[in-house]
A protein has these predicted regions:
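Active-site catalytic loop in hydrolytic enzyme cores
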Residues: 72-161
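Short, surface-exposed connector motifs at secondary-structure boundaries
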Residues: 28-34, 137-142, 162-167
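Amphipathic coiled-coil/heptad-repeat helices and related helical stalk/stem segments
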Residues: 15-19, 45, 129, 152-153
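Long, hydrophobic, well-ordered secondary-structure blocks that form the structural core
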Residues: 42-43, 52-55, 60-87, 97
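N-terminal, active-site-proximal structural segment of metallo-dependent hydrolase catalytic domains
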Residues: 1-33, 40
Length: 177
């Protein structure tokens, strides 16, 4: 987190190997879905990950390393879903994004201490936006994705009550790592 927000992201081969090993283990174990932590995967590596997903019919939910653009910090979660094109039989994958609706207070303080702005949800103006969450269906499995501090909102957690098979949470906290 610190390196990414200070514009010094880690793109080392060692880091790439660690993520590749996670994905390759999921493929070897014939997993249907792999869930990785918040801020885990650099955005530049998502297309490569998506190609692996389509070749192996593996769904992936991963936190995207914080993105900084125009002094705004975005915390995204990527949902990569492989699918078969019915008329050709070819496999493809789609990358969908969830923008974190609620930053943790300490995360927000750290970002603002660097004179950056934490972009919560899908903000189209300076006004606060309503929290937005996506409902996914993949192979008959209905799920939604929440990113870390979003889970603290009882109201937000209840949005998909009786609609989903699972609420997938990506997080990166010292107390759970």
């Amino acid at each position: 987190f610190d390196q990414a927000v200070m514009r010094k992201p880690n793109r080392s081969y060692r880091r790439y190997q660690q993520i590749a090993e996670l994905v390759n283990t999921a493929v070897r174990e014939k997993a249907d879905m792999l869930v990785m932590p918040e801020a885990c995967t650099p955005k530049e590596w998502l297309p490569t990950l998506a190609r692996t997903c389509e070749k192996n019919h593996l769904a992936v939910v991963t936190g995207v390393e914080h993105i900084i653009e125009d002094n705004c910090v975005y915390n995204l979660t990527a949902v990569i879903l492989p699918y078969e094109e019915k008329w050709t039989g070819q496999w493809h994958s789609v990358i969908l994004y969830h923008s974190k609706n609620h930053f943790a207070p300490e995360e927000k303080r750290m970002i603002e201490s660097l004179y950056l702005r934490a972009m919560e949800g899908i903000e189209s103006s300076e006004a606060e936006c309503d929290a937005k969450y996506e409902l996914y269906s993949w192979n008959g499995f209905w799920f939604t994705v929440y990113c870390c501090f979003e889970l603290t909102s009882i109201r937000d957690r209840s949005i998909f009550q009786s609609y989903i098979d699972a609420l997938i949470a990506v997080e990166w906290n010292q107390d759970v790592n």
